[in-house]
Swiss-Prot record:
Gene Ontology process terms (BP): base-excision repair
Species annotation: Sodalis glossinidius (strain morsitans)
Encoding gene per record: mutM
Matches recorded under PROSITE patterns: FPG_CAT (PS51068), ZF_FPG_1 (PS01242), ZF_FPG_2 (PS51066)
CDD domains in the record: EcFpg-like_N
Listed name of the protein: Formamidopyrimidine-DNA glycosylase
Amino acid sequence: MPELPEVETSRRGIEPWVAGQTILRAEVRNARLRWPVDEEIIALRDQRVLSVQRRAKYLLLELEKGWIIIHLGMSGRLRVLPQPQPPEKHDHVDLVIGNGCIIRYTDPRRFGAWLWSDDLRTSRALAHLGPEPLSDKFDGRWLYQKSHNKRTSIKPWLMDNTLVVGVGNIYASESLFVAGILPGRAAGSLSEEEAGLLAESIKAVLLRSIEQGGTTLRDFLQSDGKPGYFVQELQVYGRGGEPCRVCGTPIQMAKHGQRSTFFCPACQH
């Protein structure tokens, strides 16, 4: 599933093509996504895009009247087509832009979503979200305060969007490795120093992945069709049985919250 770096990469990829431009129309070939594409999007005509934003794993297109909220789901991606091209099987939604380009949404598994909101303050999709991990609000003090008396394992705890948004399976594993913290420990066992180190590690890993265009494991591609190159820098995720790049110990895999977790038993404590 695309996580924060992949969604931010998508945002940066489409922003130069659509910000300040007019969406002439939306062409919806298959409205049956995770939730049906909202009727306001299907009927969209001649609306100028004021800004392209991101909140958590959602892309937000601010229009003159209303917002388009896009979630990429498990396998969704956005492409910029400078010129029209015939759609393929999994190309479900096009935004036809006044400058001649098309923003095309492709989603083989159809777990993504295209939602409409008149006012983001009333959007159910964005309710109850925690702070952005790259914001000043998210730091070691925040993590330490929230960890008190928590018995759940640190890894699934980090993936709770009410704690911090956008940290999914890949980046939780990678951040815990950088911080030297075992993912199976109880969240309540974090010391204040460890919480600070973990917050810094999350920020560093996410920023580096954004610089590299995200991580391509299967479906994700950048808006220009290139893969995300952070996959070449993964320290533990998807490397079960392979030697740790730091100490040579075989990387182990475990299940936490029914999700695969990867870690080095020597480097993490």
